Amino acid sequence: MKSYLVLLKKILKEGSNRKDRTGIGTLSVFGYHMEFNLKLGFPLITTKKCHFPAIVHELLWFLKGDTNIKYLNDHNISIWNPWADERGYLGPIYGEQWRSWKTKDGRVIDQIDNVIHLIKNNPNSRRIVVSSWNVGDLHKMALLPCHVLFQFHVVDHVLHCQLYQRSCDVFLGLPFNIASYSLLTHMIAQQCNLKVGNFIWTGGDVHLYKNHIKQAKKQILRRPYLLPKLVINRKPTQIFNYLLQDFNLLNYKYHPSIHAKIAI
């Protein structure tokens, strides 16, 4: 994934110094675009180790509509712990917005079910969109959505996905985000009997935290390996029934991990 290293280099060279919510400070560029052809490999970075099971479990957690960290903690994943309350809740974040968007007139909308229905029944629709940016719920969320909106597009039985991410922690968060939405695209393509096409990522405030600069400079010196291949072992009856063991990542060769602290 040379494109990821190109982004790191751009931020290190051209990024603007900005203050931020965490108090750490960032180097930031605004407006960035990358495309990944999912037919050519699964876009999980190889210039440091990424924990694929954590990516899978977080996505399955979103798809469950869950907003409590217990499921993640039960699978030894603690990435959401800093924002949870004493009971483990995070407020109406991604999972609730994806699966249970509440309307003013009392309806509850399952956006994931809706997009799958549209892909199957009206693949030419320009409305195959999921949003996590529920303005009326933002004040109740422990952490506001960073990856806020994604859209699917079907051409010649091929499924494409585009994500808009308003705020992006490039060193720690972006590798997870790219892999997570690429995995979701594979899953929905399988459910809808389509082939996978491109995953397109668009970022707003795209930044390196200043306590990640040293690590980024180390990473850009590494040479990427060939991308791994994703194999899905079975087709569940619906997208909400996938399990970790349904996914095999073949030939994932990677450089050693690079430790960095998350900005809270």
From Swiss-Prot:
The keyword Membrane does not apply. Disulfide bonds: none annotated. InterPro entries: Thymidate_synth/dCMP_Mease, Thymidate_synth/dCMP_Mease_dom, Thymidate_synth/dCMP_Mease_sf, Thymidylate_synthase, Thymidylate_synthase_AS. GO terms for molecular function: thymidylate synthase activity. Coiled coil: none annotated. Keywords: Cytoplasm, Methyltransferase, Nucleotide biosynthesis, Transferase. (6R)-5,10-methylene-5,6,7,8-tetrahydrofolate binds at H51, D169, A263. Transmembrane segments: none annotated. It comes from the Bacteria. One of its GO terms (cellular component) is cytosol. Pathway: Pyrimidine metabolism; dTTP biosynthesis. Pfam families: Thymidylat_synt. DUMP binds at R21, R126, R127, R166, S167, C168, D169, N177, H207, L208, Y209. It is found in: Cytoplasm. The active site is at C146. SUPFAM superfamilies: Thymidylate synthase/dCMP hydroxymethylase. It catalyses: dUMP + (6R)-5,10-methylene-5,6,7,8-tetrahydrofolate = 7,8-dihydrofolate + dTMP. GO terms for biological process: dTMP biosynthetic process; dTTP biosynthetic process; methylation. It is an enzyme of class 2 (transferase). Its EC number is 2.1.1.45. The keyword rRNA-binding does not apply. Catalyzes the reductive methylation of 2'-deoxyuridine-5'-monophosphate (dUMP) to 2'-deoxythymidine-5'-monophosphate (dTMP) while utilizing 5,10-methylenetetrahydrofolate (mTHF) as the methyl donor and reductant in the reaction, yielding dihydrofolate (DHF) as a by-product. This enzymatic reaction provides an intracellular de novo source of dTMP, an essential precursor for DNA biosynthesis. Belongs to the thymidylate synthase family. Bacterial-type ThyA subfamily. Homodimer. This is Thymidylate synthase. It comes from Buchnera aphidicola subsp. Baizongia pistaciae (strain Bp).
